[in-house]
């Protein structure tokens, strides 16, 4: 199978490995992208668990929560230049779209476009009018809507948007202390980028794949290759615990106090407020995540290497 420049660029973007290493891995994997990532990880060349998040698209991410109706929304709207994110009309459109999502609960972006705004026009009409004013291509890319107690947080003027959903008892969500706690958890998600809420939410196939990669790494390391299987199993157990600690929100060290985990901080706040708190789910949007502008010079460089 022919290896293209696009394939090499994408693998490099996601693994931070050198272009020649990426080309070799893709060749060995016969063009299978996932297998190439595994090969690089097994060789210790690629970082585990998380993909690189190089962003190039402009616009903004926004998140908001209505405590009266108990609905939260995080949304991403993309544009061509970074000037747009500072334009009042653009920001107003993003906030209006967020309100529409809260109130009308559209199934997806296409359904959102057909919803009516408070001004009586559809979101699609409002968007087209905005494009005429700003003279840039603008697109609502994605959104997530949660019902129930939430915390919404926007970081970096719209580079990151976080929405965290909770279950609580005894109306503790109305207390200022809970609001502060919710912001802390949302900031934790922004800073530490967990992949899952807890160990139970990590798919079994993900854990199995991690173990497989760890064993392959051990087999290629002279220090561990000849160790007894029982010793290797114990080492794998420790590595999996580390994986959970790094990738599960409740197991992570609390960013504002490294002496406790997020789970311990949650338990402390719940006890202080006289109720119970459970982190149910979260959404973490990064502006332009997975989107790239054209980079002709870099593309030419890669193309010359895969010929």
Give the residues covered by each predicted segment.
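N-terminal assembly/interaction segments in proteins that build large macromolecular machines
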Residues: 2-307
């Amino acid at each position: 199978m022919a290896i293209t420049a696009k394939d090499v660029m994408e693998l490099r973007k996601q693994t931070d490995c050198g272009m020649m290493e990426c080309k070799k891995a893709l060749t060995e994997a016969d063009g299978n992208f996932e297998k190439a990532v595994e090969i690089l990880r097994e060789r210790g060349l690629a970082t585990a668990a998380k993909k690189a998040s190089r962003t190039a698209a402009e616009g903004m991410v926004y998140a908001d929560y209505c405590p009266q109706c108990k609905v939260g929304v995080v949304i991403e709207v993309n544009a061509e230049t970074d000037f747009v994110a500072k334009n009042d009309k653009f920001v107003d459109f993003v906030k209006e779209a967020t309100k529409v999502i809260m109130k009308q609960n559209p199934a997806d972006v296409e359904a959102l476009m057909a919803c009516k705004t408070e001004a009586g026009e559809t979101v699609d009409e409002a968007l087209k009018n905005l494009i005429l004013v700003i003279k840039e291509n603008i697109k609502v890319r994605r959104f997530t809507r949660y019902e129930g107690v939430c915390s919404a947080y926007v970081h970096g003027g719209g580079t990151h948007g976080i929405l965290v959903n909770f279950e609580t008892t005894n109306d503790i969500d109305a207390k200022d202390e809970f609001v502060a706690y919710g912001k802390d958890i949302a900031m934790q998600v922004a800073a530490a980028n967990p992949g899952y809420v807890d160990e139970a939410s990590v798919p079994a196939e993900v854990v199995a794949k991690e173990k497989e990669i760890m064993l392959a790494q051990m087999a290629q390391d002279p220090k561990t290759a000849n160790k007894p299987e029982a010793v290797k199993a114990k080492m794998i157990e420790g590595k999996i615990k580390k994986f959970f600690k790094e990738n599960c929100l409740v197991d992570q060290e609390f960013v504002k106090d490294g002496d406790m985990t997020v789970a311990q901080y949650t338990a402390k706040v719940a006890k202080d407020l006289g109720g119970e708190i459970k982190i149910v789910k979260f959404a973490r949007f990064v502006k332009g995540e997975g989107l790239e502008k054209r980079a002709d010079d870099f593309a030419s460089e890669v193309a010359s290497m895969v010929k």
